[in-house]
């Protein structure tokens, strides 16, 4: 069995907890996730099953949408409510100033990842160092905040919906907003509403899954990759491309755009993987068959 499960992760579970439960239901089938969702966060967590695990990296390139709750007036070590409190301050701000500051983060910005994150530096996870009381300098990374919509303000709490690029840490965003408002801030709640083609409305709660019904919720791998355009390989090229030989025929190359990834199909609408037109030839980047 190969495909994706669109899981609605509950609060309090790690992403690996979800993987382990799914693996148990599928009797130790190869299972993995497409990107960590913090234990205190809930929402969309796509789980790859079987050969779909080979395509996990191609699913994290997409936009993500979160519903976040920011608690102003408090700063914690982890930038969320579960961390030790570092500082507290009174919140004496006008709503219009809060809104203006939050919206100023829209666009391409630079963000410093939190110490409590799964990022690796010199082979070590940052959270492993943080738990030992070690803080190291982290390089700023370019991210994109496509949009922010304020949902509600009941000080000291502010709820907002954010659409962002991969690699965005909402905890860092909340911390930065609090710092700029000179009162501190920490992420209080977080729900991922969507990632790529996976939406919370179409997700399945983990508690409803069991070994009897889980198979009917597995989505074909190519549906998870609908963000990439498709291209059909004619019969005359199928043997070549399946054996790792590039297609150099201009009539085929003209159907694709240089340096762009494609979902590749053969006759019968059979998905065979991801390919790319690079250096005047089309070649498979990742095979599904």
Swiss-Prot record:
GO terms for biological process: mRNA pseudouridine synthesis; tRNA pseudouridine synthesis. It is an enzyme of class 5 (isomerase). The keyword tRNA processing applies. Its EC number is 5.4.99.25. The keyword Isomerase applies. The active site is at residue 38. Keywords: Isomerase, tRNA processing. It holds the Pfam family TruB_C_2. GO terms for molecular function: RNA binding; tRNA pseudouridine(55) synthase activity. It catalyses: uridine(55) in tRNA = pseudouridine(55) in tRNA. Belongs to the pseudouridine synthase TruB family. Type 1 subfamily. Responsible for synthesis of pseudouridine from uracil-55 in the psi GC loop of transfer RNAs. This is tRNA pseudouridine synthase B. It comes from Clostridium kluyveri (strain ATCC 8527 / DSM 555 / NBRC 12016 / NCIMB 10680 / K1).
